[in-house]
């Protein structure tokens, strides 16, 4: 569960219950993200596969059941067959800097990841409410 969160484009920034900051990217272009995942692992694929076929094959190769974790990527097959992909970030502060740069959010380089994440969430929520 998250104490607070904000969405910017494909990115979600959250303050978790323990105060840690989490950033993930929920891909709009799922097939493109599946290609990115496959290529990062040297997984051969057929360009004619649809998103459901592609996702199911990657899950079979790298996961189990309806989910696969491939490095920082997660592939999920929903009950209706729909495939979702998202990416987490090892370097949370770098992801926060990237989002800050894209949104015009000015930050203090001395802020901790928790400070920066919390303030960025407030900024994004204010931006979204305008």
List where the protein language model places each region.
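Acidic, low-complexity, intrinsically disordered interaction modules
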Residues: 16-20, 24-57, 61-109, 114
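Short, charge-rich amphipathic interface segments used for partner binding and complex assembly
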Residues: 120-121
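Short acidic DE-rich linear segments
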Residues: 127-130
